[in-house]
Amino acid sequence: MAATIDDEVHALAQRLWDFHTAPAAHSPPTPGEHDIILALGSHDLRVAEHAAHLWDAGAAPLIVLSGQRGRRTAGAHGHDRWPRPEAEEFAQTARATAGIPSTAMLLETHATNTAENFTHSRALTAAHGIAVTRAIVTAKPYMGQRALATATAHWPEARWTFHCFAGGYTDYPNADTPTEELVHFLVGDTQRLDVYARRRWSSPVDIPDDVWRAYELLVARGFTNHLVDNDTTSHPRPTGRSVP
C-alpha cells in the first residue's frame, strides 16, 4: 500500500512526535554542569549545529561526535553517499557554527548504530582518561526516547540529559527530509523501542496505548520504510515492559 499524507496521518504522526520528543530538556543547561556533549551522527547536520551551540554556551568542555555512516548516509534509498563518516561531517559543521577547536572535540568514526554510538564513545572517552558522570546527548528531536533508553543500557554510570534543536513536527521537515519520510522515521523509531528492548539492546520504555495504536494505524497506512525485522525469538523479552 502506497503511503500518502492526509489529515489523519498528520494527527497520528503528531502523537508519535509528542511521545518521542517528550524527554527533551526545555531549559538551557547550566554552564559547566556536564562532562561531555555526545552528538549522535545522522544525515541531519542540524544536530551538529545544536551541539556546537551547546558547547558555545558552556554546557560542557568537550563534544564527542559519533558515527560512521548509517543506511541513508551510506547511500540507501537513492540518497547520495557521504564521502566521509558522519562524525567528520559533524565536526566540520560544528567548527563552522561556533569555531570549536579540535582540542574540544573527540571524533568516534566507527559506530553504525545507536548502541555503538554509546559503546564506542564510552570506550573513547575512557581511553582519553575522561571521567563522564553527567552528560548531554543530542540527536534528531524524535530520537529522545530511544537515545536515553540506549544510554541507560550501554552507559549506565553516567547521568544523561537529552537536548535537541528547537521546532515541532510541522517545523522539522525540509528539502532533505520531507514530511512523508519523517513519518516513516517516527514509525520506525516507535517499533525500535519495542523490538530493541526485547532484544536487550536498549532499556524498556513504557509506550502508552494511544501511541502504540497510532503506530499500528500508520503501519496499516503504508509507513513501513524504516521498520526492522521483528524476529526476537533468540532475544528473551525483558521484564517491566508495558507495550500492549
Predicted segments, located by residue:
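A conserved mid-domain beta-alpha-beta active-site/ligand-binding segment of alpha/beta enzyme cores
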Residues: 175-232
